[in-house]
C-alpha cells in the first residue's frame, strides 16, 4: 500500500507469486500448507474502464480526413470505412484479402475473427464505394492482401495506427471534440457498436 501500485500491478504480482507456489507444491511438500494459503488469496477487484467511442460527427470527420486524390488517401479512406462499418479489430482489418469478398461483390465481406471464427458481414454503400475507389488505384502485381504499404507489402498494425493518428489530427480541425479522445483502432471498433 505504501508503494502506490495500481490494482492491476498488484494483481499481476500476485499472479506471479501464485504461479511460483504452484510450481513449488509438488517439489517441496513441506511448503504445501503455505502454498495453499497463498494460492487462496483473492485478487483485488477493479472497475472496468469504459472504452471511448466517437460520435457520428467525429466519425464523419475522421472518414473524410484522408486525401481522396492520393492513392494512400484512397487506401486509408477504404480502411477507415471498413474498420468502422464492419466493426473490425485491427488484426481482422489488416488480414482482409482480395478473395474475402464473396463472388467478387463488395456487398458482403468474409472475416476470419478471433478463435478462427468466420463471419460474413454486410457492407454499406459508402464503404463499398471507398473500397472500389482504392481498388482502382491499388497495384495489381502484389500480394493478395487488400491493404498494402507503399512498398507493396501488407500494411502492419503499427502502420495502420500511425495513419489513424494522422487522420485524427486532420479530423480535429473539423471536429475539435475528437482531440479530447485517445482514438485507437479499438475505439473505432467500439464506435460502430
Region locations from a protein language model:
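Conserved catalytic core of the tyrosine transesterase superfamily
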Residues: 1-192
Amino acid at each position: 500500500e505504501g508503494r502506490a501500485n495500481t490494482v492491476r500491478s498488484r494483481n499481476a504480482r500476485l499472479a506471479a507469486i501464485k504461479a511460483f507456489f504452484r510450481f513449488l507444491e509438488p517439489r517441496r511438500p513441506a511448503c504445501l500448507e503455505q502454498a495453499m494459503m497463498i494460492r487462496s488469496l483473492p485478487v483485488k477487484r477493479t472497475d472496468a474502464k469504459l472504452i471511448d467511442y466517437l460520435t457520428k460527427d467525429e466519425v464523419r470527420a475522421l472518414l473524410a480526413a484522408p486525401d481522396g486524390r492520393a492513392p494512400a488517401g484512397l487506401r486509408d479512406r477504404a480502411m477507415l470505412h471498413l474498420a468502422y462499418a464492419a466493426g473490425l479489430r485491427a488484426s481482422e482489418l489488416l488480414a482482409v484479402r482480395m478473395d474475402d469478398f464473396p463472388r467478387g461483390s463488395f456487398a458482403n465481406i468474409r472475416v476470419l475473427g478471433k478463435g478462427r471464427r468466420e463471419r460474413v458481414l454486410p457492407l454499406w454503400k459508402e464503404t463499398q464505394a471507398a473500397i472500389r475507389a482504392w481498388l482502382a488505384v491499388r497495384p495489381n502485381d502484389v500480394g493478395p492482401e487488400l491493404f498494402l504499404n507503399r512498398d507493396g507489402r501488407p500494411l502492419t498494425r503499427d502502420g495502420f495506427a500511425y495513419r489513424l493518428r494522422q487522420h485524427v489530427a486532420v479530423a480535429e480541425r473539423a471536429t475539435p471534440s475528437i482531440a479530447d479522445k485517445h482514438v485507437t483502432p479499438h475505439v473505432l471498433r467500439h464506435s460502430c457498436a
